[in-house]
A protein has these predicted regions:
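ATP/adenylate-binding site constellation spanning eukaryotic-like Ser/Thr protein kinases
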Residues: 84, 103, 159
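Non-transmembrane, membrane-adjacent beta-strand/coil modules in membrane-associated proteins
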Residues: 4, 89-150
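Transmembrane-cytosolic junction motif
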Residues: 70-85, 91, 96
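N-terminal membrane-targeting/pre-transmembrane regions
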Residues: 2-54, 133, 157, 161, ...
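Short aromatic/basic micro-patch
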Residues: 13, 81, 100, 153-156
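Single-pass alpha-helical transmembrane signal-anchor segments
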Residues: 59-75
Length: 176
């Protein structure tokens, strides 16, 4: 009966988050611009860049490697799907498939404010005193406690929408 009611909800929350904070863009853009300036200075004017300059090929390789790293970092992200089956998430590019926690496996689930630095040591895939965290930005997360005692926090920007969804799930699961 509970599963039928969940399926009848027919509601899905999708969320994609990427490392696109303004300060990250400025940091990577600034470093990339400095390396590009050095590259162009050295290649066009022939003036070695810096007091211990790299060869022309070395500066080209440095620029290409840093640019590829910045693009890789900027495209890392967290995808979350919440539906009538449970909570599904993956951290791109490190997870090919979604990790799924079915509602039947979850003993407690709530949206809460947290301190990424104090509780988990920052953003990304992190391990802290409260278990694993998968977060990209912000300080709002879905705190999941599984029936086996495992605890997972998934960062979110859709905290209000998810809280409303969780309230619906909770009301369906209450005995009549």
């Amino acid at each position: 009966l509970v599963i039928d009611k969940l399926a009848a909800m027919n509601e899905v929350i999708l969320e994609k988050q990427y490392f696109r904070q303004w300060w990250i863009i400025i940091l990577f853009g600034g470093i990339d611009a400095i390396i590009l300036y050095g590259l162009l200075t050295q290649l066009i004017t022939g003036t070695p860049w810096g007091d211990k300059p790299l060869s022309d090929i070395g500066v080209i390789i440095l620029y290409i490697c840093f640019t590829l790293f910045a693009l890789f970092f900027m495209n890392m992200g967290l995808q979350t799907r919440i539906d009538d089956h449970g909570i599904h998430f993956k951290f791109i590019p490190f997870s090919r498939r979604f990790t799924t926690y079915l509602w039947s496996e979850i003993s407690k689930c709530e949206v809460r404010e947290y301190s990424p630095v104090k509780e988990y040591g920052g953003w990304g895939i992190r391990y802290g005193r409260n278990g694993m965290a998968y977060n990209v930005s912000g300080n709002q997360g879905i705190d999941i406690i599984l029936k086996n005692g495992k605890r997972v926090l998934i960062g979110t920007k859709k905290n209000i929408e998810i809280q409303l969804f969780l309230s619906k799930i909770e009301s369906i699961n209450k005995p009549i």
